[in-house]
Regions:
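Solvent-exposed, well-ordered loop and adjacent helix/strand elements within mature globular domains
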Residues: 1-148
Length: 148
């Protein structure tokens, strides 16, 4: 197994194509939390008690914007992600699961709000709710409806 604890991030403003599903999903549903992570409302009625983190993954995990995932780390942390961008296959390993620094999950953030330790370390892994190696990524099979 790889050390997958490094978790990169990108500012949501780097997605600039106003016609793209990525841009429109983030514009419609995205908001920054107090720590600078872009989030979308969780679906309390479906048992998702926490808001989704807006993330990018390699194509191995799926390519449809709006796909939801339950992600568990080896430290026991569980968080939910919604696919808002795709890692370029050219920048990932042969199975398109992770990039050169073994990062599996990339978080979409507002760098103006992002907590300083994450900026300083260059990885969201220092934020304790996201800490640990990625143990599992489970695709959730209901369609996101805006958390209504």
């Amino acid at each position: 197994a790889i050390n997958s604890s490094f978790k990169t991030y990108m500012d949501y403003r780097t997605i600039t194509n106003k016609l793209s599903p990525q841009y429109n999903f983030i514009k419609t549903w995205g908001r920054s939390d107090n720590n600078g992570f872009m989030r979308a409302n969780g679906e309390r009625d479906l048992g998702v008690t926490d808001d989704y983190y807006m993330i990018a993954l390699g194509s191995y995990y799926g390519t449809e914007i709006g796909t939801k995932y339950k992600i568990t780390t080896d430290t026991g942390n569980v968080f939910y992600g919604v696919l808002c961008d795709q890692k370029d296959d050219a920048h990932t390993n042969s199975t398109h699961q992770y990039a050169s620094n073994n990062d599996v999950v990339e978080f979409i953030v507002d760098t103006r709000m992002l907590i300083s330790t994450v900026k300083r370390m260059g990885s969201a892994n220092v934020y304790m709710p996201l800490n640990g190696n990625i143990a599992s990524i489970e695709k959730m099979d209901f369609i996101w409806n805006g958390g209504e």
